[in-house]
Amino acid sequence: DCVRVFVSDGNLVLEFVQPERGRKSRSFDMKDVKLSAVVRMPELTYLRLSGASKLTTGDEFAAGARFDGALSGASSARGLSVSAGRGELRLSGASSADLKARFDEAFLMQLSGASNASVDVRSDDVRMTCSGASNVKVGVRDAGHTGVRLSGASQATVSGETVDLKVECSGAARSDATALTAQHASVSCSGAGSADVEVTGELSVVATGGSSVVYGGDAAIVSQSVGRGASLRKR
C-alpha cells in the first residue's frame, strides 16, 4: 500500500506514499526502504533520474525520432543502449552514465558539476559541452563533425574517427583527442587549458594565456595565433 505505480501523460511513475501514523500495518521507516523495479518496455524516448536513484538496462531501446535523457544528484545509469534520429544527454551534480547509442542525425551531451560519462556513439554530428569538474570519455564512429567545448576543470577523452573536429578549452580544462583521427581540426585554448589532437589534414590554432596545444599526424597548419605564455608544438 505504500508504493504507487501509475501512468501519467505517458510516463511510468513509481512513487512512495508516506505511511499514516499509528497504523500498525505501516509501522516502518521509509528511510529504510529501497525501491527496486523491473520494467520491460519496447521504447525509451525520455529518461530522468535524480537523487540517488540507479538504473540498469539490458537490451537496446528504440526511441524513434528523439531521445532525451537527464540525470542529476548522485543518480546513475548503466548499460544504457539507445537508437534514435537525434539524442541529448544532460548530467549534473555527481551523476554518472554509460551509454552506447546510434543517433542518425545528431547527439548533444552536456555535463556539469562532478558528473562523469562513458559514451560510445555512432552519429554524423557529435557535440559535447563540459564544465565544472566533469569528466567524459567518448568513442565516436562515422562522425562528420565532432565538437568539444570544455571549461572549468573539466576533462574529455575522445577516440575514433571524424571528418571535422572543433575543440574549445578554457580555465584549467583538458581535452585529449590523441586517439581521435580528424581530417580537419580547429583548436582554441585559453587560460590554463590544454588540447592534444591527431590531424591528417588542415589545422587552425588559437592559443592564449598559459594554454597549450599539441598535435600529431600529418597536420598542415593553415592558421595560428599563439599568444605570449601559450604554446603550440608537434607531438
Identify the residue ranges that each predicted region occupies.
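Acidic (Asp/Glu) and glycine-rich low-complexity loops/linkers
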Residues: D1-S72, S76-S92, S96-S112, S118-T129, ...
